[in-house]
Curated annotation (Swiss-Prot):
The gene is yhaI. Pfam families: DUF1878 (PF08963). InterPro entries: DUF1878 (IPR015058), YhaI-like_sf (IPR035945). This is Uncharacterized protein YhaI.
């Protein structure tokens, strides 16, 4: 039987091959997580942040808020240090995740660039 190290090495190789065969342009956020080496827990934390901020965005819109700069600041402050804020926002948007929230963030960033 193969040693555990050889089995892990083989699985890593298979995953690298699978990543090359999948159209990663369709899944830029997942590709970003893989590229930056985030763990499952770290990836789930990003999703949890987006869930919470999406709920807060809906609440603030219902209350009549029109500026959401503080939500972007919260996102940037809570985002894993392995990830770039701009790159993550565009990857989430392009993959179709948290579209409304990411559109708001992109609009804010356009005003500062």
């Amino acid at each position: 039987m193969d040693s555990m190290d050889h089995r892990i090495e083989r699985l890593e190789y298979y995953i690298q091959l699978l990543v090359k065969t999948v159209d990663m342009d369709r899944y830029p956020f997942y590709a970003l997580l893989i590229d930056k080496g985030l763990s499952k827990e770290e990836g789930e934390a990003v999703m949890r942040i987006c869930d919470e901020l999406s709920e807060e965005l809906a609440t603030q819109k219902a209350q009549g808020f029109v500026t959401f700069d503080k939500l972007l600041a919260l996102f940037a402050g809570q985002l894993n240090e392995k990830l770039d804020v701009h790159e993550t926002i565009f990857a989430l948007y392009e993959q179709g995740l948290y579209q409304e929230l990411m559109e708001v963030f992109i609009d804010i960033m356009k005003h500062f660039d």
